[in-house]
Amino acid sequence: MQSFTDTPDFQLTTKNTPSVVMTSDLRKVYRTGFWMNQKVVSLKGCSLTVYQGETFGLLGPNGAGKTTLLKLLLGIIRPSGGKGLLLGQPLGDRHIKQRVGYLSENPYLYEYLTGWEFLELAAGLFEIPASVQRQRIPELLDLVGLSVADAQKKQMRRYSKGMLQRVGMAQALINDPELIFLDEPMSGLDPLGRYRMREIILSLKAAGKTIFFNSHILSEVEKICDRIAILSQGELVCSGSLDELLGSQNTYHVQGQNGDWEILKKWLANLVYEPDGYWQGTLQEDYYDFLASVRLMGGRIISMNLSRQSLEEFFINQIQKQDTSLHEVIDQSEV
């Protein structure tokens, strides 16, 4: 009997970098209603790969299926179809969980425990010896920027949101995991808290950890991630490196002088005419042909600067395309 890991489309490596997360046509359908005869499709055939040592961002609007995908990968819920591997083993493998860290969105932390006691509890679940705990816990507190005094003396009900998030991050790292899942790690944090969380994630990346997280704060994702995927309405809209996705729609801000105004309007968006024959606009076409056209009409280029769209602009564009496609399908089905 052939294992699904042997199939040609489900290999564990690409070039020289092994994958640590891989899914193929992963699906999740929930049953609802009094008789459990109604179906809600939460995830529709998701196929993606996360490689060792990279920081991977999962993006999508509310209700897109991001948390469902995380729970499937972690083995918290079972898939309705498809297949997946986590660190080379099928999803749900108990032994793999020893090598994984997880920070959920808005985690419940035992408020009458101190941060230190909570980390001892988390370490005990992994059967980490007390001697190792005494060394590991102070190291983690230092990493997440929480003082030993606060961790030992204050009950967590007296912690700020940022302090709770840092304790949550420390417990996700208590077992020194190879792969770390973070569900909205910057949710509810102020700018300073986001900065500190970003620095923690970057330090983990520098240490060779693989990080899989979802977030609505796209500016932070753009600073941190190597690759991203966008989910919308349970479907994987796109995935790839930021350079691949954002670089595919590069634009150029062009400033020049002289030339035929009507021809320039055909090439440039947002064209503005200025005194003494100067003009500026945005170019989204092949700039080689544009430069040749400017020379032929006697104009000159003063400057041309590459202006890559932001992740936020790309994200909104992709979601709007997905919504438009969905409405078109619905409209056609009603004809």
From Swiss-Prot:
Residues 21-258 form the ABC transporter domain. InterPro entries: AAA+_ATPase (IPR003593), ABC_transporter-like_ATP-bd (IPR003439), ABC_transporter-like_CS (IPR017871), ABC_Transporter_VariousFunc (IPR051782), P-loop_NTPase (IPR027417). GO terms for molecular function: ATP binding; ATP hydrolysis activity. Keywords: ATP-binding, Nucleotide-binding, Transport. ATP binds at residues 60-67. It comes from the Bacteria. Pfam families: ABC_tran. The keyword ATP-binding applies. PANTHER family: ABC TRANSPORTER ATP-BINDING PROTEIN ALBC-RELATED (PTHR42939:SF1). Belongs to the ABC transporter superfamily. This is Uncharacterized ABC transporter ATP-binding protein all4389. It comes from Nostoc sp. (strain PCC 7120 / SAG 25.82 / UTEX 2576).
